[in-house]
Amino acid sequence: MSTPTDSKAPLRQVKRVQFGILSPDEIRRMSVTEGGVQFAETMEGGRPKLGGLMDPRQGVIDRTSRCQTCAGNMTECPGHFGHIDLAKPVFHIGFITKTIKILRCVCFYCSKMLVSPHNPKIKEIVMKSRGQPRKRLAYVYDLCKGKTICEGGEDMDLTKENQQPDPNKKPGHGGCGHYQPSIRRTGLDLTAEWKHQNEDSQEKKIVVSAERVWEILKHITDEECFILGMDPKYARPDWMIVTVLPVPPLAVRPAVVMFGAAKNQDDLTHKLSDIIKANNELRKNEASGAAAHVIQENIKMLQFHVATLVDNDMPGMPRAMQKSGKPLKAIKARLKGKEGRIRGNLMGKRVDFSARTVITPDPNLRIDQVGVPRSIAQNLTFPELVTPFNIDRMQELVRRGNSQYPGAKYIVRDNGERIDLRFHPKSSDLHLQCGYKVERHLRDDDLVIFNRQPTLHKMSMMGHRVKVLPWSTFRMNLSCTSPYNADFDGDEMNLHVPQSMETRAEVENIHITPRQIITPQANKPVMGIVQDTLTAVRKMTKRDVFITREQVMNLLMFLPTWDAKMPQPCILKPRPLWTGKQIFSLIIPGNVNMIRTHSTHPDEEDEGPYKWISPGDTKVMVEHGELIMGILCKKSLGTSAGSLLHICFLELGHDIAGRFYGNIQTVINNWLLFEGHSIGIGDTIADPQTYNEIQQAIKKAKDDVINVIQKAHNMELEPTPGNTLRQTFENKVNRILNDARDKTGGSAKKSLTEYNNLKAMVVSGSKGSNINISQVIACVGQQNVEGKRIPYGFRKRTLPHFIKDDYGPESRGFVENSYLAGLTPSEFYFHAMGGREGLIDTAVKTAETGYIQRRLIKAMESVMVNYDGTVRNSVGQLIQLRYGEDGLCGELVEFQNMPTVKLSNKSFEKRFKFDWSNERLMKKVFTDDVIKEMTDSSEAIQELEAEWDRLVSDRDSLRQIFPNGESKVVLPCNLQRMIWNVQKIFHINKRLPTDLSPIRVIKGVKTLLERCVIVTGNDRISKQANENATLLFQCLIRSTLCTKYVSEEFRLSTEAFEWLVGEIETRFQQAQANPGEMVGALAAQSLGEPATQMTLNTFHFAGVSSKNVTLGVPRLKEIINISKKPKAPSLTVFLTGGAARDAEKAKNVLCRLEHTTLRKVTANTAIYYDPDPQRTVISEDQEFVNVYYEMPDFDPTRISPWLLRIELDRKRMTDKKLTMEQIAEKINVGFGEDLNCIFNDDNADKLVLRIRIMNNEENKFQDEDEAVDKMEDDMFLRCIEANMLSDMTLQGIEAIGKVYMHLPQTDSKKRIVITETGEFKAIGEWLLETDGTSMMKVLSERDVDPIRTSSNDICEIFQVLGIEAVRKSVEKEMNAVLQFYGLYVNYRHLALLCDVMTAKGHLMAITRHGINRQDTGALMRCSFEETVDVLMDAAAHAETDPMRGVSENIIMGQLPKMGTGCFDLLLDAEKCRFGIEIPNTLGNSMLGGAAMFIGGGSTPSMTPPMTPWANCNTPRYFSPPGHVSAMTPGGPSFSPSAASDASGMSPSWSPAHPGSSPSSPGPSMSPYFPASPSVSPSYSPTSPNYTASSPGGASPNYSPSSPNYSPTSPLYASPRYASTTPNFNPQSTGYSPSSSGYSPTSPVYSPTVQFQSSPSFAGSGSNIYSPGNAYSPSSSNYSPNSPSYSPTSPSYSPSSPSYSPTSPCYSPTSPSYSPTSPNYTPVTPSYSPTSPNYSASPQYSPASPAYSQTGVKYSPTSPTYSPPSPSYDGSPGSPQYTPGSPQYSPASPKYSPTSPLYSPSSPQHSPSNQYSPTGSTYSATSPRYSPNMSIYSPSSTKYSPTSPTYTPTARNYSPTSPMYSPTAPSHYSPTSPAYSPSSPTFEESED
């Protein structure tokens, strides 16, 4: 029973959180311990002591007692605070730094601010920092820091501010004029020190007690309090000193009771007892007047205990310990860190209604299912509200109780009482009433959330449907492993059961697995076909795979969408055989088109002569849902963009794509069962010749290595530039050995036959790669550690049994054996070394990337798309104007090609310019009418000209956007594929002329682009913004749908073009980002997830001389930390003019940049004693010395006898382009007259500099010092030598250590120019790359291109070029890191991160220094890092948290304003009046699941018609129509009531299991007859609700008079839907009873059934996915007596008006039944007896026996309904079947066994022989093809009955509809006014 305190009233939302400091008064008022806690003891005589630490007033101590304050027991009493009065104030350790800051801002003596509040600077500060008290204190502190004299005050003269006030003058001015001490903190003490200017006052230093500080702070006025960034109401400065200490309630510090032992008190209690002891000691001593130093000691002690209560890990402070010696856990430690209060208990908690167990695979589940063990299903519950519709079912579950499955655990009454069914309650308690809740067991098709940690991206939690299975593990489909990153080696996963209908609705419509197939991270699928299925698909689709009749029969049984027709076998004689491709074609749903290649496709084939026939069958082509050629593999069924699954998702919607996964697996796996695939040792053995080749290759590699070693020994090896000899040698050896591995691997792979199982797996892509093959068969290859060969471990060898200095391959880790042959011990050892490195790397990387991801998420968690389309953070600051700069979401965009960018002018003109003058061509392309229309009109030519001009200008702007000729763009609406689809749908014959006028095309494209808007609004800025957002899309549309292409290439007809344009618009609208989408979290996950795939350490490029680049995780860290000192800063310097092309000139620039010191060009230096300048001791220098000293220009006597002789390296000098003169010049400039420097000629043999010291004039006379001097001279020369070598810059920029010059390796670094002919040409020009950066200086050098030169040091770019440049730079650097690993992340995520980092105009690092310095709420900041500091800060400044972010709301347990929570719903009270009352008289009789449809909103799937979705803006929420329906823009198929497979039905009814649908657990249960006619009005056709609930999306029962279809309804506004449209006329075969689609005996074909009308199942290319097929009567497993025909099956739902038994028009007893009934008035044409639809068909004619009032129905002659039929319980008397029973009411033609039309098994057949006696097939003579259907007259070539697509075998293809969708055939009929060229739909928008 729940306690009475739990109120049912909803809690108010917390609007904001105010932080502050508890004032002493407040602590006392709050406290329940009068007089404070004074005793350190807890108990006294076995009872808790009053005034002790376990004071009974503070809370409950054990389970038996009650609280003395609130009289609650343990569960009710929250605990109450006490307090301790401290004898002396002490500092609060959390606020001590703040205290010092405040002290430094106010006068030590008079507490006035050191700067007058009236100072204009202060006023400016207050203005600037409004609402940001933290900043205010910082500004004021900076202002006051320098002041040493108190001069505050009101009437102070501001002019005197900077003058020293006269010390003799009386201190006035309101301040006190005292000198201010400087205040310092040491440990827990503050010291004040006066440094005095006046001579008379001595310096003094005193310790400032907390009491003194408290006095100072107490006197700060409220006004100044505010200026100092505090708050007089919530946080006064003096409250930062502790005078009264709150004692936390007992609930916060519970004692642990050990049985038999004493209570173990909590750490906080221990600490508090220390404080009380110290406090009492101090009191006692003070009272007894002890010595001052004793009292000081006591105060210190108290101070220490109070400090360690709060924070016990202060640096430089002893820890407070327990007796056992482990440090106490202070309050700070409780809050901070991952396990702390904030992150451990508030941000993340353990939850109820969850389960966790091991996962195992099950290929027979659909991807959106999860197998749940029965034991778990019996334990987890879902609270279901009892309604009149489910009360019987619930009663049954309650009766079964908890012990049996399915049952229930609890009943929750409407007053909140819980009845536990485990403890056999009284039977009277079990009675249910409407409004009770039953917590029932989990059962099939309940929605749950499935999750695997680590949850790295949103696809790690997805919605699934339960499938209860035996045994104890979760079962899941194999395709789901990739998004979860799961495998079945013991992984465990979690399952969460949502507890409300709203949550379930969200899971179903947003979260369910099929909707997550595509990841926004890289706009490609995350799930593909994997493992054995992939191997099997590749095996099965090979050319030589044939399947016998028996096997085909067997396989088709596993295909739920099979339509009971065997396809034509491809081989008839000697026996019928089908190919694997044929079987696969049956699985492919709908109208899907695709061209891809197989993994082994040779590229040269595309240009070669065989490009059409593909000799190896490697070109995959799927056309119209048929696999025409090609072998499928991972490329077409894997997770790549543009794979079959991706296309299927985009074209046919998530639901079909989801089923497609399952169907592939069931069929293919069952084929694999009799094909088989096993791999053994035999598959790894190659033939002897291959082994010889391998041996040869390895031998050759070893010889090569020996040669290289030889060369290196003899110094013949030329070091590559930039590398030492040793590096060059290592690189060479490594290259030789790696080539050897690859070569042997190649020959090994070649030796494997087509039938090799290992190869089969590699080729299909399911497991393994070529490296694996070569390592298993040929050789394992070189083992590396840290990117180098195995290093020497000890004494110059790797292992003890190799000789010293062995550089050969074996001893340095080359493994020449294969895994098959086995490794030698030393090889094994090296292999283990390499492997160990990999493991360590992975482990370290996981931690690193995990932290990176957490920081990214915390930085961007609350960034969301708002309703104005902008992207903002939680504080409402603008991050982006449109998400991703184009306002589109990442899932629905694809890679497309911009056709115009790369073309040369000539081919551009040839392909895009429409040449009207070429008459022969025109006659071939257009019909005569069009040509006539064109020649008559003058504007036509102008329009075409204008179009051409527009294309040219488009091309120019594209070339500006993509200056390097990049033509791949990411845009919605894949035009090539859509055009292909159109050609299929409308059967475009490319050889016939088209009736589409070019003017029509131009206008159509123009209106289309006017309607594809991202930024609405007509002002200039909005228009410009929209132009920017949609420019690429516009260019793509204009170039693809230019008149020339549309007419000549595609030959689209007028209606095909109209359809295409409408389709593009719809898709474009669908691709827009939804408001409420949390794009920040998405972006963070999309970047964090690829980071886990990067390697941690940086491999240096082997070989070429190039700078080392930091890559991978370390570089990523540098970028997002914005590190000031990157590991490898570097500039890429592009050159201009001659320097770019001429290597010599480029070298000049290089020399000007590279920093050169004297050391770099010096060969050797020496110091000589050479006393005679003229006759030198070095004979080779004699010559040039003579030249110099013949005519000395200085006093030779001053020269020192010591000589520094520097010999320079000629090669390096010329390399650096230096001359001797330059160097001497530099020396002279540096040392001036003090040195004498002479040098020889630049062309001499040796370049020599001779340097001597010049002694000063006066020195030469001091003889006695001379000896010393000599000594000094040579030492001095030494110093000078060292200084010159290292510090003297000869040339270059100091920061740039080395410059590499090379030609660009990649196109991106080449200069791209556009030639005269308009082609792109990449010119390789010299470029320089540097180690070290100094951008400012480099940019100012001549010959440097200032535009393209860039740095990889982000901070530097910011300083030099500003914020916009740095934003681009961050994006470029991130991209470079990702691309190095071949990862692709959609631009929008990178852009969002860059924008978050730069939005405020400075760089915000993604670290605590960036994220926590933002203006976000304190709660959000404290949930990231520095928890306690942030909270203390917030308290000191009295911040308020506005509760707008995600973290804040989660901490408070509220729904954050995001996703579906970022808007409110309004109730339309008007509509409620039309709601259907459920009369109480129904009692329990009205039960079927179908009856659920009566209450409009009773199931989530029915609400859509009332929501704005009807404007088709958010198509992602109504599934199957998702995209196919999209093909009928705005057509009825969009009716959201086709919302999902289950939609009209009760939420868990799944068409795939009619037997188990909850509404019909068995024929025995729940008869549906609302007994009283009083209900009938509820079904009147005008009720707005019934339309929504009619399961048949667009079946004729939508009477046009229903408000939903009224022409004013927004969706159907255009005249097409007026009741006169052919939609409802007899030609509309989709609805005519003769339509073959509706086999009357199959419930699924009844026009009411959801599926039939669900457009996505309608038009499917190979009879797939029309679920109806599964139930057709011919299919053996659905005999008419099977329960799926039971009248309770929802297909006969009474709510569907056409069968509604209770609706007066059908009740046989009701007088209104006469044909003259007013109900049949022409107002409701679809029911009017004159409606040809109903009258022409025999079963509706009033004469038809169906209308007879007698119960002919049950005539025993009708075999179908004979009473013994098992499905009717054999009891004709059973209430359901009384002739009065409404569902057999004669009105319902369905049940008239005598109607010749409707009983295929009945002996009579209608004379027209519409249904051939076999019942299931429909002969071509069926009226379906009768000529009276004007459109498809047999004369029409396109639709001749023989047209293969319409073979009667393809039953669900209603041939009348080009799209094949029975739902909206008239839509596509070319004669339909809806598509007439004047159709309003496409001229003016349907608002």
From Swiss-Prot:
<dbReference type="InterPro" id="IPR007066">
    <property type="entry name" value="RNA_pol_Rpb1_3"/>
</dbReference>
<feature type="binding site">
    <location>
        <position position="67"/>
    </location>
    <ligand>
        <name>Zn(2+) 1</name>
    </ligand>
</feature>
<feature type="repeat" description="31">
    <location>
        <begin position="1868"/>
        <end position="1874"/>
    </location>
</feature>
<feature type="repeat" description="2; approximate">
    <location>
        <begin position="1586"/>
        <end position="1592"/>
    </location>
</feature>
<keyword id="KW-0832">Ubl conjugation</keyword>
<feature type="repeat" description="6">
    <location>
        <begin position="1638"/>
        <end position="1644"/>
    </location>
</feature>
<feature type="region of interest" description="Disordered">
    <location>
        <begin position="156"/>
        <end position="178"/>
    </location>
</feature>
<feature type="repeat" description="21">
    <location>
        <begin position="1791"/>
        <end position="1797"/>
    </location>
</feature>
<dbReference type="GO" id="GO:0005634">
    <property type="term" value="C:nucleus"/>
</dbReference>
<feature type="repeat" description="12">
    <location>
        <begin position="1706"/>
        <end position="1712"/>
    </location>
</feature>
<feature type="repeat" description="19">
    <location>
        <begin position="1777"/>
        <end position="1783"/>
    </location>
</feature>
<dbReference type="GO" id="GO:0006366">
    <property type="term" value="P:transcription by RNA polymerase II"/>
</dbReference>
<feature type="repeat" description="32">
    <location>
        <begin position="1875"/>
        <end position="1881"/>
    </location>
</feature>
<feature type="binding site">
    <location>
        <position position="150"/>
    </location>
    <ligand>
        <name>Zn(2+) 2</name>
    </ligand>
</feature>
<dbReference type="Pfam" id="PF05000">
    <property type="entry name" value="RNA_pol_Rpb1_4"/>
</dbReference>
<feature type="repeat" description="3">
    <location>
        <begin position="1598"/>
        <end position="1604"/>
    </location>
</feature>
<feature type="repeat" description="22">
    <location>
        <begin position="1798"/>
        <end position="1804"/>
    </location>
</feature>
<keyword id="KW-0240">DNA-directed RNA polymerase</keyword>
<feature type="repeat" description="8">
    <location>
        <begin position="1678"/>
        <end position="1684"/>
    </location>
</feature>
<feature type="compositionally biased region" description="Low complexity">
    <location>
        <begin position="1860"/>
        <end position="1881"/>
    </location>
</feature>
<feature type="repeat" description="29">
    <location>
        <begin position="1853"/>
        <end position="1859"/>
    </location>
</feature>
<keyword id="KW-0238">DNA-binding</keyword>
<dbReference type="GO" id="GO:0005700">
    <property type="term" value="C:polytene chromosome"/>
</dbReference>
<keyword id="KW-0479">Metal-binding</keyword>
<dbReference type="Pfam" id="PF04983">
    <property type="entry name" value="RNA_pol_Rpb1_3"/>
</dbReference>
<feature type="region of interest" description="Disordered">
    <location>
        <begin position="1579"/>
        <end position="1887"/>
    </location>
</feature>
<dbReference type="GO" id="GO:0003899">
    <property type="term" value="F:DNA-directed RNA polymerase activity"/>
</dbReference>
<feature type="region of interest" description="C-terminal domain (CTD); 32 X 7 AA approximate tandem repeats of Y-[ST]-P-[STNVAPGN]-[STGMA]-[PSTR]-[SNAGCQKTLRIMH]">
    <location>
        <begin position="1579"/>
        <end position="1881"/>
    </location>
</feature>
<keyword id="KW-0597">Phosphoprotein</keyword>
<feature type="repeat" description="14">
    <location>
        <begin position="1720"/>
        <end position="1726"/>
    </location>
</feature>
<feature type="repeat" description="10">
    <location>
        <begin position="1692"/>
        <end position="1698"/>
    </location>
</feature>
<dbReference type="Pfam" id="PF04990">
    <property type="entry name" value="RNA_pol_Rpb1_7"/>
</dbReference>
<feature type="binding site">
    <location>
        <position position="70"/>
    </location>
    <ligand>
        <name>Zn(2+) 1</name>
    </ligand>
</feature>
<dbReference type="GO" id="GO:0003677">
    <property type="term" value="F:DNA binding"/>
</dbReference>
<feature type="repeat" description="26">
    <location>
        <begin position="1832"/>
        <end position="1838"/>
    </location>
</feature>
<dbReference type="InterPro" id="IPR006592">
    <property type="entry name" value="RNA_pol_N"/>
</dbReference>
<keyword id="KW-0539">Nucleus</keyword>
<dbReference type="Pfam" id="PF00623">
    <property type="entry name" value="RNA_pol_Rpb1_2"/>
</dbReference>
<feature type="binding site">
    <location>
        <position position="80"/>
    </location>
    <ligand>
        <name>Zn(2+) 1</name>
    </ligand>
</feature>
<feature type="repeat" description="20">
    <location>
        <begin position="1784"/>
        <end position="1790"/>
    </location>
</feature>
<dbReference type="InterPro" id="IPR007081">
    <property type="entry name" value="RNA_pol_Rpb1_5"/>
</dbReference>
<dbReference type="InterPro" id="IPR044893">
    <property type="entry name" value="RNA_pol_Rpb1_clamp_domain"/>
</dbReference>
